[in-house]
C-alpha cells in the first residue's frame, strides 16, 4: 500500500510506483547466473604485451598527457563498506563473547596488521578505557569490534570504503581516496603538472570526503610535484533501490520507505 507520504518521497527521488513494482518483481524472480566457460587467463581474454609493446603503449600515453587534452581520473567512491564487515557485525550480535569462527579468530590474531590498527587502539581507549591488548587479555573482544564499527568509535560500519584506512606503509596508512590521489599524480598529470580527479560520492558522505581531501591533498601535491584539481558529484536518488522484507514487501523504517542508495538490485537481493 502506497501512502501519500510515500508518493511524496518517490516524487522527490524521481522514482515511479511502476519502478518500485519492477524492482520487487526482480527480487521475487531472482537473477539468473551467468554460465562461465573458463576463468580469464592470458590465453582467454587477458592481453599480455611484451616488453616492446609495453614501451609503445607507455610512450603513447606519455605523449598524450603532454598535449592540450584534458585527462580526468574518474573514481566511483560511493560504495558502502558495511558488507565488508558482515562477519564482524554477526560476531557483535552473537550470543557468545569470544571468537568462535575461523574468521573471528583470524581477525584478532592478525589485528595488528590492519592499516587502521593505531586509530582503533585510540578509539578503544576512548570508548572502553583500555587499549586493544588489554581488552583482548580481559576477553572483552566485542568492545574492540564495537569501537571499529559503531559511531562512538571509528564508525567504519557506516562509512564508504573510500574513507577507510586500507594500506599500511612505513610512513603511515592510506585510505583508498589517498591512493587515488597518488595514482593520479603518477599517471594522469598533464604537461603542466595538473591532475584532475573526480569522485562520485553519496550525499551523506560528501563532507567527509571533502574534509579528507582538504587534510591530505596538499601533502601529496608537494610530494609528487603536482597540482590537484579535485571535484565531486553525487549519484541521482532516482537510481536508489527499494529495500524489501523477507515477504518481498517494501521495508519501512519508522513508517518511511527505506531505499538502498548506490547499489545494484542484485546486491540488494544478496543482502536480503
Predicted regions and their residues:
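Low-complexity, highly charged intrinsically disordered N-terminal segments
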Residues: 1-44, 160-171, 190-201
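Extended, charge-enriched "interface" segments that sit outside catalytic cores
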Residues: 20-38, 93, 97-140
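A phosphate-binding catalytic loop at a beta-strand-loop-alpha-helix junction
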Residues: 71-87
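Short secondary-structure boundary/capping segments
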Residues: 87-94, 212-218, 245-251
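Histidine-anchored nucleotide/phosphate-binding helix
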Residues: 95, 173-191, 215-219
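Active-site cores of enzymes that catalyze phosphoryl transfer or operate on phosphate-rich substrates
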Residues: 124-173, 177, 249-259, 270
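Short, conserved secondary-structure transition motifs
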Residues: 201-208, 232-246
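Residue-level detector of conserved catalytic or cofactor/ligand-binding positions
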Residues: 263-269
